[in-house]
Every structure is written in structure tokens, then in C-alpha cells.
Regions:
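Conserved cofactor-binding/catalytic machinery of classical short-chain dehydrogenase/reductase
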Residues: 149
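Conserved N-terminal beta1-alpha1 strand-loop-helix module at the mouth
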Residues: 1-92, 99-126, 142, 152, ...
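Glycine-rich beta-strand-to-loop/alpha-helix junction loops that act as flexible
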Residues: 130, 162-167, 185-187
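C-terminal binding/interaction regions
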Residues: 178, 182
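Short, glycine/charged-rich beta-strand-loop motifs at protein surfaces that mediate ligand recognition
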Residues: 137-141
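Paired acidic/hydrophobic, glycine-rich loop segments that form the ligand-binding mouth/hinge
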Residues: 85, 183-184
Length: 210
């Protein structure tokens, strides 16, 4: 299984963009494109539906050594051997999420300011999502942070930080130039004509030495 510290490209499998029946194919395409870890985000689905899907997807991701993270519902980690859970600002505390999971899992947290990122690390987050960097339909209520805060957040916290929000191959170079080492991509990846090819192009920018 890949270590979090080695992960650079975080693929978000958002069922707002992908049909539940297409989720396994998209997951395999992400893996073919060398995505480092994958999050299942299913805001409009029941916990039972997510449990069933996460179980199927985990067979695929675990065989490839790619961690699978579930969004919001820490209790799913008690039923499916996923590697982690991801929390928003309005979700459970990290301690409560770990208790619900009932075992050691990675716990990440979405943050929308430097202060929230610092607090998430203090609370014990294994990684943070930092954004939205650019305007994005997945976070319409949040003002874009822009590029200027990226370097500062990397200077202030030590846990892996994944920049997120409106990041696509066309602006990824700007995000990296602003100090990002890791990114999470949602619609850019999911809407790509060839998901694997798109992911590989992103990884080439994130890992120029390879």
C-alpha cells in the first residue's frame, strides 16, 4: 500500500459526476493513470449504497496498492477495510471519527484557510485538503483562496497538504509554481476523455524528476 507521504495526485471519485454503475471503471482508469490515492465522495447516496460500493472498489484499489478514502461517513470504515476517511469542516471531530471507525485509519480534513489547516494538524489530521484554490462547482459557497496562500500553508504545517478546488491540467503548473507539492483533482479528471492519460500528464508535472 502506498505511503501517504509518497502520494502526490489524489483522485476524487465524485458520484455527482460519475454514475454509480460506472464507478469501478473510472476507478480502474485512475489506477491505470497512476493516481496515488482515491476518495469516494457520494454526497447524495445512502450509507448502505456507499458501503456496498466501497467494498467493491476496495477490492480493486487494494490489489493495486492504492489507498481508498471514504468521504464523510467514518462508520463505513468499521464495515469496509478502507484505508481512511475524509472529513469536512462541519463533520465529526477527528477523535469521534476515529472512534466510529473502530480501528486505525487515515483521517484527512478539508480546510479553507491557513487557520483551519493549522487547527486540523493540531487536532491530529493525517493530511489536509487546502482550498478551493480556484472557483469550483463542487464548493460553490466558498470563496477561492487563490495561489498566494499555498506557500504559507506549507511553511506552517508539516502534514501532507493537498491543494484542491478548480485544479486542472491547464492551471496545475501555476499551482505547483506557487508551492504546491500535492493536489486533489475532481472534475478535471472525471470529465477527461481519457482519465488515465490525463492523470499521467498531471503526475508528470508533479514528479518532473521521474
Amino acid at each position: 500500500m502506498r505511503n501517504l507521504s509518497d502520494c502526490r495526485l489524489y483522485g476524487i471519485l465524485d458520484l455527482g459526476y460519475v454514475g454509480i454503475d460506472d464507478a469501478e471503471r473510472v476507478t480502474k482508469s485512475m489506477i491505470d493513470g497512476d493516481v496515488d490515492l482515491i476518495q469516494l465522495r457520494a454526497k447524495e447516496h445512502s450509507v448502505k449504497e456507499i458501503v456496498d460500493l466501497a467494498g467493491k472498489l476496495h477490492q480493486v484499489t487494494s490489489a493495486a496498492g492504492v489507498p481508498l478514502i471514504v468521504n464523510d461517513h467514518a462508520e463505513i470504515a468499521a464495515k469496509v477495510p478502507v484505508e481512511g476517511v475524509h472529513l469536512g469542516q462541519d463533520d465529526d471531530s477527528l477523535a469521534h471519527a476515529r472512534k466510529k471507525a473502530g480501528r486505525h485509519v487515515l483521517v484527512g480534513k478539508s480546510t479553507h484557510s491557513l487557520e483551519q489547516a493549522v487547527e486540523a494538524e493540531r487536532e491530529g489530521a493525517d493530511y489536509v485538503g487546502f482550498g478551493p484554490i480556484f472557483a469550483t462547482p463542487t464548493k460553490p459557497d466558498y470563496q477561492p483562496i487563490g495561489l498566494t496562500g499555498i506557500k504559507r500553508v506549507h511553511n506552517e504545517i508539516t502534514v501532507p497538504t493537498f491543494c484542491i478546488g478548480g485544479i486542472k491540467i491547464d492551471n496545475l503548473g501555476q499551482v505547483i509554481a506557487a508551492g504546491a507539492r500535492r493536489v486533489a483533482i475532481v472534475s478535471g479528471l472525471l470529465k477527461a476523455p481519457n482519465i488515465a492519460k490525463y492523470a499521467r500528464a498531471c503526475k508528470a508535472l508533479l514528479n518532473p524528476e521521474t
